Amino acid sequence: NVTMGAADADEQQVRRALSVAQADFVHELPLGLDTEVGEQGLSLSGGQRQRLALARAVVGEPRFLVLDDPLSALDVHTETLVEAALRQVLERTTAVVVAHRPSTVMLADRVALLSGGRIAAVGTHQELLRDNAEYAWLMSGAGDEPAGPVEEPAG
């Protein structure tokens, strides 16, 4: 179902989309691209499902693309490969990317920092690092730490 939403995509576009998404594993499935993977792809790992979703998103070479944390379920090695290929796709399209990982945020030409449900700052990654303490704090990884100790219920 890689061509879902882009039924007119040719074989070359499908191969390119699979390559961008590092989803070449589909060729190792019993029937390749024709393999049934079950409802919602339940026979695939989370990372495999995410890579197929990314391939589906880029197969039609859209002019506008919305991606919601497109690399969150990938291991570090695959994430690095997908990022490199995704950079090429993003050069040819307008994209809105919701991201939490610093490496994904750095793919953007412009970054909008959301805080308290509002846009708190807009700029390049470097501008926000320099000029916005909250952004710098989040990019440092400090935002990944728990807010405080978890209290155990009394017994």
Task: Describe each model-derived feature in a short phrase.
Residues D24-L52, P70, L74-H77, E145-G155:
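ABC-fold ATPase nucleotide-binding domain signature/coupling loops
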Residues N1-G38, R87, R92:
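ABC ATPase nucleotide-binding domain helical subdomain, centered on the C-loop/LSGGQ "ABC signature"
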Residues L54, V98:
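Hydrophobic anchor residue at the start of the ABC signature
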Residues V59-R63, R92:
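A short, proline-enriched helix->beta-strand linker immediately N-terminal to the Walker B motif
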